[in-house]
Amino acid sequence: MIFGIMGAMPDEVDQLCAKLENVTVEPYGGVDYHKGTLAGKQVVVCCAGMGKANAAATTQVLITKFGAEKIIFSGIAGNMTSKIGIGDVVIGKTVLYPDAQLDMICQNPPFLKEYTGDPELIAAAEKACAKAGVKALVGTIATGDLFVGDSETKAAIEAKCAPDCVEMEGAAVSQVAAKNGVPCVILRAMSDNADEDGHEVLVVKKFSIAEYVATATRIVAAMVEAL
């Protein structure tokens, strides 16, 4: 079994890369793919870059070139629900695009308007979060290419699909994984509330995600060990 583990920013994968054993790094298509073992399992870890195009391209490379048989994407997101707070995690049961013409996208394989996280990976993520003492919600993740940092945009997305969080890669990863028949799950820690304060924290003040990254590394490592 080969696990493909992804993040959008270097900070989201660097700590995990440091935990790998028997590491080799293979550059391909502008991305460094770190091949090694984690908890005795074969993994390939990479930083895809931000946005849907980067995420989709990197997912396909993980599957086609590196033989990934399960995909785990871990990163931060903007919170859209009162059920959880900053630092809590959304595990993607449903992942979708709020900004796409879905009746056109679903005309091609995998013929879906939204994507479903793999039940085994979701269960493993829930157990890993519980073990790490992290509050987790199995819910809906919305993916768009624009950072959501104002109340008007947040309200529009809420009215359209009522997601639990918003981010910029998950649906693209999930779409490509589904197209290839590869199990996938998206994990997101809440860094902000997808409003003006979120823009200030992430864009202006360059929010440090070190605390989440340490937690995410434990969660992903525990998942891989259990699977």
Q: What label would you give each PLM region?
A:
Residues 1-20, 42:
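Short, conserved "active-site rim" segments that organize catalytic pockets and cofactor/ligand binding
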Residues 2, 26-227:
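Glycine-rich phosphate- or other oxyanion-binding loops that anchor nucleotides, phosphorylated ligands
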